[in-house]
Amino acid sequence: MNTDESARREAIATSRRWVVKIGSALATREGQGLNLEAIADWAAQIAEIRAGGREVLVVTSGAVAEGSARLGWRSRPASLNQLQAAAAIGQMGLVRGWELALRESGLLAAQILLTHEDIANRERYLNSRSTLLTLLQLGAVPVINENDTVATEEIKLGDNDTLAGMVSNLVDADLLIILTDQAGLMTADPRQDPDATLISCAPVDDAQLLAIAGGGGAWGRGGMRTKVTAARLAARSATSTIIASGRSPGVLRQIGAAQPVGTLLRAPATKLAARKQWLASTLHVRGSLRLDAGACTVLREQGKSLLAVGVTAVEGDFERGELVSCIGPDGQEVARGLANYSAAETLLVKGLPSSRFEERLGYLRDLELIHRDNLALV
């Protein structure tokens, strides 16, 4: 560990607010019921971290696996109804396991269940944030999971790595810890390449990280790729991420002692404004705008609003005020924001200067398709 990494880990170790994400492979016994001994150990470590003046939020998976075990199922169900039924049954055991473990360590647990709607709706987003911050002020440990019982494809977050990244944004966390069944992010899949080595530290926006990340296991929904994506999501609130093995004894204590465990993905020092964090965190867009190279440059380098003259194509069916994605000529997402005009209106004015809006539409509502205050780079 070099001097720069050592200094960064020491700063992170003493940071105030941590989000700890624990996946199904760790919270359960290979998908067959909860690993209560492991949960008790993490709870004891969290109590030590809390005693050092830090705040901790837990994002935990395992409800579907626990419910399946209680139902006698040997594999993850395929149908949505069965998944939701298993989640409903398993969530009872999951939250009780955490409640008892945290209580044994002298801590108060609080259950929070979220869906994408709670993030996408601005009012519910702010209310979720207020609730979480109030729980921290009261000294409780929020135990958070996706509400699989009611989530449909339209409102699913997708996996708890993504949820952990969003929670980090919600509460302006200093550190996101993603515990997994691997030592951290490797140079290659260690199950296929015996020469793979651990990446100790890297900037979260390193373009090579996603290229070397792999897939997930049978019970979890997220592989290493989703963990890197979650780290990038968390970085929007200047939250650094450590991906480490949850099976390493005392892993949270080691992180609290600035030990070189896992992979540290460094976030930039600057964070997005709160409103733009919310915009960037909303996963479900209603449509997309294809931009020319000039428009991409204006958005990325000058921080200006999106004008119709730089739009080459319109995709999807969206209304005024709905979220749209801005796609560059290379097919990569550049930004997302709230549309000032519907898809039908945008089709009529794409490629035109704002001075011709009234001619084509019969009215001029706004000069911009997306105002810079409602636009977030991704």
Q: What is each PLM-predicted segment?
A:
Residues N2-R76, L80-L108, I112-V378:
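C-terminal catalytic "cap/lid" subdomain
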